[in-house]
Amino acid sequence: MDTQAIKHSVQHSGRYNRKGFESPTQRAKALGESYQSDLIASIRENNFSFEKGRLKIKLAKSFGFCWGVERAVAMAYETRRHYPNEDIWMTNEIIHNPSVNNHLSRMNVKIISAKNGIKDFSSVSTGDVVILPAFGATVQEMQLLHEKKCQIIDTTCPWVSKVWHTVEKHKKHTFTSIIHGKYKHEETLATRSFAGNYLVVFDLDEAEYVSNYIQGHGDKNKFMNKFAKACSDGFDPDVHLERIGVANQTTMLKSETEEIGKFFEKTMLMKYGPANINDHFLAFNTICDATEERQDAMFSLVNEDLDILVVIGGFNSSNTTHLQEIAISNNIESFHIDISDRISVENNSICHKPLESELILKKNFIPDGKIKVGITSGASTPDKIVADVIEKLIAITQ
């Protein structure tokens, strides 16, 4: 599939909009009214610290909405203002945040339904308005919407587009794309659609498994069974792992992505030698700045001698999950919640989601005496939600 030709056709159709409809000033004003918080602004100005009574709060120095998310949410809202009466669809949630998506639902912006991972575009009529979310859409979806003559509003984060360009470069030069990500995540599904031959690896353990195979250790049938849902059609590890390039889902843990990239470079050096490395490995730089900043800030926050840590963000948010992993790896009691309503002031309890688990209720969430609470939030979490959480902590400790 000539993905570049399809993109060019879509983007030059006259029914494609990547810039939005309002000025930056209008956009900032609209977002500020919905999602900004005076409390959070004052905490930022006070070196990200807040104290009241026995409660001390320390915010991460980088948290919450990133530029790409702000842009996507603002464009979605202004699309409804620009098209007040038209049917408006999204190919998926605009971002992984329940409050934002519920707000859009109340504005009658609908998500295209899916069953068993297959989207049903039959409800989308010719000329309808369709929003592509921050983590993008597959090239096949773009082509289908183009053929339906839909008005396409593309809010894809530029960092995600950069990954697409990377895997297209791999394809052009007949390199297989090794994608560090979750093979079912919406962003990785989109990236896969732009790649040629690809293999998705979730973590360093899977990278080591692939490396061992490249070096001649492993069983082909076992390999294909392990990666059956995470590789391109017709993938042959004996052929398609001779020339590889690395890319990533932008919300993965930065340190792990870097480690996987270096690991595969070392693997190809060992197999083919320094003189031939450029024929067998392509270096990469697709780590998102915002993801990197939030993870670095989290690594600093966990050194603040905290009693507990609250991580705020959608439960299906990959970047938020990785912030939670950092807390756990530093042995800090942490609680991942998506909305402030998970905290009960009356009962001093929190309903939170541990990694790889269902929601559980923690009673006596805030102990007696002085307490220092660290707080961070994922890139899809508005300041207002963080402020609501802080207000509940204040109420519990009064």
UniProtKB/Swiss-Prot annotation:
GO terms for molecular function: 4 iron, 4 sulfur cluster binding; 4-hydroxy-3-methylbut-2-enyl diphosphate reductase activity; metal ion binding. (2E)-4-hydroxy-3-methylbut-2-enyl diphosphate binds at residues 96, 185, 250, 317-319, 380. CDD domains: lytB_ispH. Dimethylallyl diphosphate binds at residues 96, 185, 317-319, 380. Keywords: 4Fe-4S, Iron, Iron-sulfur, Isoprene biosynthesis, Metal-binding, Oxidoreductase. [4Fe-4S] cluster binds at residues 66, 157, 288. InterPro entries: LytB/IspH. Pathway: Isoprenoid biosynthesis; dimethylallyl diphosphate biosynthesis; dimethylallyl diphosphate from (2E)-4-hydroxy-3-methylbutenyl diphosphate: step 1/1; Isoprenoid biosynthesis; isopentenyl diphosphate biosynthesis via DXP pathway; isopentenyl diphosphate from 1-deoxy-D-xylulose 5-phosphate: step 6/6. Coiled coil: none annotated. It is an enzyme of class 1 (oxidoreductase). Pfam families: LYTB. Isopentenyl diphosphate binds at residues 96, 185, 317-319, 380. The active site is at residue 187. Its cofactor is [4Fe-4S] cluster. Catalyzes the conversion of 1-hydroxy-2-methyl-2-(E)-butenyl 4-diphosphate (HMBPP) into a mixture of isopentenyl diphosphate (IPP) and dimethylallyl diphosphate (DMAPP). Acts in the terminal step of the DOXP/MEP pathway for isoprenoid precursor biosynthesis. PANTHER family: 4-HYDROXY-3-METHYLBUT-2-ENYL DIPHOSPHATE REDUCTASE, CHLOROPLASTIC (PTHR31619:SF5). Belongs to the IspH family. This is 4-hydroxy-3-methylbut-2-enyl diphosphate reductase.
